[in-house]
A protein has these predicted regions:
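Hydrophobic alpha-helical transmembrane segments in multi-pass membrane proteins
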Residues: 25, 29-32, 39-49, 54-60, ...
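Non-globular, low-confidence helical/coil segments that flank catalytic cores
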Residues: 127-128, 137-142, 153, 182-185, ...
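Aromatic-rich juxtamembrane segments at the membrane interface
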Residues: 2, 165-294, 552, 644-647, ...
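Alpha-helical transmembrane segments of multi-pass integral membrane proteins
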Residues: 341-438, 694
Length: 746
C-alpha cells in the first residue's frame, strides 16, 4: 500500500483537499466550491509539471464521475417515491419510545422509511420497549415527504434524512400483525444485536448508570437522558459521548491483546480485525466518527501513518460513504482528526496536551460556529478534565461492568454517576452562558479556516500573526454583527414571533411564540419528553444571527401562542426589558410567568415610541386599560426605512374600528394580520381603508383550526394585497440598508 501511495503524482493530502472542493461543488451545487476547485487546479498546473498535473486531472475526473453518479442516484430516489407500504421490516436498534410515541426505521422493497406510530396502550408500549429481534410489521399507513427547512439557518429534516438514505416518512394508522422473522442480512443482524445490548443494559442497570453505559459503549442515548443532554451541550462537552478514536483504540487494542494471548499470529490477527471492525461499527450504529476512526486504525495496520493515513481515509470515505461530509458529525469528526494529526508531533507532557487542546478548540471554532452558532469557553477546561475521566476511568469501568453483568450485575457503583450528574448540574449553574458567535456564511467560513491555518503556519512570525489575528477578529465580528437591517417573521408553528434588528445592533423581539395548552388528560405512560417551539425555531435562528441580547421584548397579548415560550427565551438570552400592555397585567398566570423571568417589566402606553432603524415604532393601542383580552393587544406602527409597518397582535374587529377612528389617515405598506388570519380580525372595512401592499400571516402548517380562514383570504385577494404565510413560505425576512428586499425560506 505504501508503494501505491508513492505512485500518486502529488502528496495524498493535497489530492484529498482538492477532491473535497469538487465534492461540495457537486453534492451541494456550490458555485463557491467550484470556484475553489478551479483555482486549485490552476495552481496545480502552475506548481507541478503538466504531465503530473494531467494525471491528477484524470483522478479528479474519476472521482467526479463517482460523485455525479451518486448524486444522480439520490436525485432519482427522491423522485421515484413509493405509492404505498403495507409491510416493513423493523431495524431494532432504531426503535425509540417517548411517552405514547414510537419511531423507528423500517425497510421495504429496498427502501428505508422513517416510521411513526402512536401507541395505543401501556402494554403495547412495553412490548416495543422490550423488542430486540427482527420483526416484520403489517400495517395501514400514510406515506409523506419529510418536512424541509422552515427557518433561515434552521434544521433541515428532509436533507438530514436524505443523508441517511431516507426519502419518505410513514405514519402508521393501524398495526395489523407483528411477526418475528429470520434474516441473512448482516446489517439487520447487527441492528438486532445492538438492540439486545441496549435492552439488556436498561433492564439490568439503574438510572443514570445505564445511560452512560449505552452512551459510551454503544453510542445510544435515550429520551430519558434529555435533561442531562442539554446540560452537557450547554457546557460544550456533549462530544464526550461521541464515539471516536479513544473508544475505537480501547476496544481494538483490547481485542488484539486478547487474541495474541490466545496464541494467534499477527498475520491472522490482521484479518480478524476487519471482522471485529465490522461488528463494532454495527454495535455503535455505524456512527460517522467510529467509521472514520476504524478506517484510520485499519490503514495504520498496513503502515500508513500521519497525513497519508488521514488523506487516504478521506478518499475511502468518498467511496464507501458518499454522504459522510454532508453531516455535521462527519465534518466535525474529520476536522478533529486532521487537527490532531497536524499537532501530534509537537512534544509530550502536560504542556503539549494543553497546547494541543487550545489548537483544537481554536481550529474547530469556525466549524462549530457554522453548525451551532455558539461556543462555550468553559469547554477548554471541562474537556481537558472530563475527557480523562470518561476515557481512562468510565470507559474501562463500564466495559468491565457490562461483561460481568452476564454473571452478576454490579449496580452498587451507580452512586458514582449520580455524583457525576450532580457535579455537572453544579458546574452548569456557575458557568457562564455560551458565547454566541453567529453562523458564518460560506465565504466567511472559508476565510476563517484559511486565516486560522495561516496563523498555525506562521505562529512564530509575530508581525504576520498580529495582522492575521486582527483579520480573524474582523471576520468573527461580521458573523456576529451582520451590517444590515432586518425584520424577520419566524416560522414558529401556530404561534407568532417577529425579530427586528438595525444596522447598529439594536434588537426588538415582538412575541416569542408558544403552543396552546391542551385540555386533554393523559395517563402517566403517555407523558413524553418534549422541547418547546422556541428551542427548535426561534432560539436557533437568533443565535445564528449572532444575537446574545434582546434589548426590548414586546409581548403584544397574553395568548400562549404569543407568550408560551417566554421562560425558554429569557433563559437563552439576556433581555433588557419586557414591554406589555397595562391590561395584560390583570392576568394572574401571565404576571406569574413575568416574575419567573426575573427580568425588568414595563407597561407601555399609547404614544410611546421605541427607536429603531433610525426611526421609531409607535404604540397606537390600547387606549384604555382592558382585561388582557385580544382587543387589549399592543399595536405597533412605524415607518421603518422605506415602508410603513403595522403590527396588530391579536386585535379583533372592534379594536380595528377604534384604531381607524383614532388614526383615519394611517398609511400602511406592510400589515401583520391579527389572530393568524382569523375571520374575526382583518375585517373588510379595515383592509379597504388601509389597502396594505403586503400582508404577513404567521400560522402553523396543517393547523387544527384551519387558519387563515377562507373569508380572510378572500378579503385580502379583494384588495390585491400580496400575502406571505409562514405555513407556505416558511420564515419571511426583510433585509436592506436604505430600502427593503423581501425573501422567504421557500
Amino acid at each position: 500500500m505504501l508503494q501505491w501511495i508513492k505512485n500518486i503524482p502529488i502528496p495524498l493530502i493535497y489530492l484529498s483537499f482538492l477532491l473535497l472542493w469538487l465534492y461540495y461543488a457537486i453534492f451541494s451545487a456550490s458555485y463557491l466550491a467550484l470556484l475553489g476547485f478551479v483555482f486549485l487546479l490552476v495552481c496545480l498546473f502552475i506548481q507541478f509539471p503538466w504531465k503530473l498535473a494531467g494525471k491528477v486531472l484524470v483522478i479528479c475526473g474519476v472521482f467526479a464521475f463517482w460523485f455525479l453518479f451518486q448524486n444522480w442516484q439520490q436525485s432519482q430516489a427522491s423522485q421515484n417515491l413509493a405509492d404505498s407500504v403495507e409491510r416493513v421490516r423493523i431495524l431494532p436498534d432504531t426503535i425509540k419510545v417517548n411517552g405514547d410515541s414510537l419511531s423507528f426505521r423500517g425497510k421495504s422493497d429496498g427502501r428505508i422509511f422513517q416510521v411513526y406510530y402512536k401507541l395505543q396502550s401501556e402494554e403495547e408500549k412495553e412490548a416495543f420497549q422490550a423488542l430486540t429481534d427482527i420483526h416484520d410489521l403489517e400495517l395501514e399507513g400514510k406515506l409523506s415527504e419529510p418536512e424541509g427547512q422552515r427557518n433561515f439557518g434552521g434544521f433541515d429534516y428532509q436533507a438530514y434524512l436524505k443523508t441517511q438514505g431516507i426519502y419518505q416518512t410513514l405514519n402508521i394508522k393501524k398495526i395489523q400483525s407483528l411477526q418475528k422473522v429470520g434474516s441473512w442480512d448482516i446489517g439487520e443482524n447487527l441492528s438486532s444485536l445492538r438492540r439486545k445490548a441496549v435492552v439488556w443494559i436498561k433492564t439490568h442497570f439503574p438510572d443514570p448508570m445505564r445511560n452512560y453505559m449505552t452512551g459510551l459503549l454503544l453510542g445510544h442515548l435515550d429520551t430519558d437522558f434529555e435533561e442531562m443532554n442539554e446540560l452537557y451541550s450547554s457546557l460544550g462537552i456533549i462530544h464526550l459521548f461521541a464515539l471516536s478514536g479513544m473508544q475505537v483504540g480501547f476496544f481494538m487494542d483490547g481485542f488484539k491483546k486478547l487474541l495474541l494471548r490466545l496464541g494467534l499470529t499477527q498475520e491472522k490477527l490482521k484479518w480478524l480485525t476487519y471482522l471485529f471492525s465490522l461488528i463494532y461499527a454495527g454495535l455503535t450504529g455505524f456512527s460517522a466518527s467510529v467509521i472514520r476512526s476504524l478506517l484510520q486504525k485499519l490503514l495504520a495496520q498496513h503502515g500508513v501513518k500521519g497525513l497519508d493515513n488521514f488523506a487516504l481515509t478521506v478518499l475511502v470515505l468518498f467511496i464507501v460513504m458518499p454522504n459522510f461530509f454532508l453531516t455535521a458529525g462527519g465534518v466535525l469528526s474529520c476536522a478533529y482528526a486532521f487537527i490532531l494529526t497536524m499537532t501530534s508531533k509537537e512534544g509530550e507532557g502536560l504542556k503539549a496536551v494543553a497546547r494541543e487542546s487550545l489548537v483544537i478548540s481554536l481550529g474547530i471554532l469556525p466549524i462549530l460556529s457554522f453548525y451551532f452558532a455558539e461556543f462555550q469557553p468553559w469547554s477548554f477546561l471541562l474537556t481537558f478534565v472530563f475527557s480523562f475521566l470518561f476515557d481512562l476511568v468510565f470507559l474501562p469501568l463500564l466495559s468491565i461492568l457490562f461483561a460481568l453483568s452476564f454473571l452478576y450485575p454490579v449496580i452498587q457503583l451507580n452512586f458514582i454517576f449520580e455524583w457525576l450528574e450532580g457535579m455537572i448540574r453544579f458546574v452548569s449553574q456557575v458557568a457562564s452562558k455560551p458565547l454566541v458567535f453567529g453562523q458564518p456564511n460560506a465565504w466567511l467560513l472559508i476565510l476563517l479556516l484559511i486565516s486560522l491555518a495561516l496563523v498555525y503556519d506562521l505562529r512564530k512570525n509575530i508581525k504576520k500573526l498580529t495582522v492575521l489575528s486582527l483579520l480573524i477578529t474582523g471576520l468573527f465580528f461580521l458573523t456576529k454583527h451582520p451590517l444590515e437591517n432586518e425584520i424577520t417573521m419566524m416560522d414558529v408553528g401556530q404561534g407568532e414571533s417577529i425579530f427586528l434588528r438595525d444596522v447598529t445592533g439594536k434588537t426588538i423581539l415582538i412575541d416569542v411564540g408558544g403552543k396552546a395548552e391542551s385540555d386533554k388528560k393523559i395517563e402517566k405512560w403517555q407523558e413524553k419528553a418534549t422541547t418547546s417551539n422556541a428551542q427548535r425555531t426561534l432560539i436557533p435562528y437568533l443565535k445564528s444571527r449572532g444575537v446574545a441580547k434582546i434589548d426590548q421584548l414586546i409581548l403584544t397579548n397574553t395568548d400562549k401562542e404569543h407568550v408560551g415560550d417566554l421562560l425558554e427565551v429569557t433563559k437563552a438570552f439576556h433581555v433588557g426589558e419586557i414591554l406589555v400592555s397595562k391590561g395584560s397585567l390583570k392576568q394572574k398566570e401571565f404576571v406569574a410567568e413575568l416574575q419567573a423571568t426575573q427580568t425588568k417589566v414595563r407597561s407601555v402606553s399609547v404614544g410611546e415610541n421605541l427607536p429603531i432603524f433610525g426611526g421609531q415604532l409607535e404604540v397606537l393601542s390600547p387606549r384604555k386599560i382592558g382585561d388582557g383580552g385580544h382587543d387589549d393587544s399592543l399595536v405597533l406602527y412605524g415607518k421603518l426605512l422605506d415602508r410603513h409597518f403595522l403590527f396588530t397582535g391579536n386585535l379583533e374587529e372592534k379594536g380595528e374600528k377604534d384604531l381607524l377612528k383614532q388614526y383615519p389617515d394611517l398609511e400602511v405598506d406592510v400589515l401583520k394580520a391579527g389572530q393568524h388570519g382569523n375571520k374575526k380580525s382583518s375585517s373588510s372595512a379595515f383592509l379597504e381603508k388601509l389597502k396594505p401592499e403586503m400582508t404577513l400571516i404567521s400560522v402553523g402548517k396543517n393547523n387544527r383550526t384551519k387558519l387563515p380562514h377562507q373569508e380572510t383570504s378572500t378579503r385580502l385577494e379583494g384588495i390585491n394585497s400580496k400575502v406571505y404565510r409562514t405555513d407556505q413560505q416558511g420564515a419571511i425576512r426583510f433585509k436592506g440598508w436604505n430600502s427593503w428586499k423581501i425573501e422567504s425560506v421557500r
